[in-house]
């Protein structure tokens, strides 16, 4: 039995209890153990959970995600970035804002199954997506490759370089117009 993270911490759900029940059923159907990150939404807080589910309000994504078979989340920019960097396939269940775009991008990159919008999500569809993410050799390999590429990037150095170029260009523009 593999281990998957379910992160719905800041997703505003009208019915957190229904979301929790769906997630628990999906884990059961998929044969996965789960780490449920409850976060701000407090999903599952104070409720007895099955023995194959561990719950925490928060854990560092950089530590947790690489240890998982799959990461299931809403598709916010931060969680998506952490998932991509971890080198582990992601199952995205977008709700609103930029989440659908990130979900499509993860799928297009080959590091996650097709997006499963939270509004129409079923336990059966989520379980199938978790199984696919956790067991697809091609998806796992592509996620690992992309994770290594992202980890090798010098993001801070690159943004510093781009910012310097921008400042230089702006300075030249002002002098030329001056």
Residue map of PLM features:
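Residues at alpha-helix caps and immediate loop-helix transition turns in enzyme cores, especially N-
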Residues: 15-19, 102, 155
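Short amphipathic alpha-helical segments
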Residues: 17-18, 47-49, 83-86, 104-105, ...
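C-terminal amphipathic helix plus adjacent low-complexity
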Residues: 123-178
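Donor-nucleotide binding loops and adjacent catalytic segments primarily
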Residues: 1-70
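A donor-sugar binding/catalytic signature common to diverse glycosyltransferases
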Residues: 56-105
């Amino acid at each position: 039995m593999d281990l998957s993270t379910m992160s719905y911490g800041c997703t505003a759900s009208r019915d957190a209890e229904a979301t929790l029940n769906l997630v628990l059923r999906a884990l059961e159907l998929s044969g996965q153990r789960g780490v449920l990150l409850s976060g701000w939404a407090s999903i599952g807080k104070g409720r007895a959970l099955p023995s194959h589910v561990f719950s925490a309000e928060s854990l560092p994504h950089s530590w947790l995600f690489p240890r998982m078979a799959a990461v299931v989340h809403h598709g916010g920019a931060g969680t998506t970035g952490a998932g991509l960097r971890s080198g582990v396939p992601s199952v995205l269940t977008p709700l609103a804002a930029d989440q659908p775009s990130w979900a499509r991008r993860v799928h297009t990159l080959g590091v996650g199954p097709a997006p499963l919008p939270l509004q129409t999500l079923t336990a059966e569809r989520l379980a199938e997506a978790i199984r696919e993410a956790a067991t697809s050799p091609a998806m796992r390999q592509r996620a690992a490759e992309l994770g290594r590429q992202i980890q090798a990037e010098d993001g801070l150095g690159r943004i510093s370089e781009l910012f310097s170029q921008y400042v230089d260009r702006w300075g030249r523009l002002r002098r030329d117009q001056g």
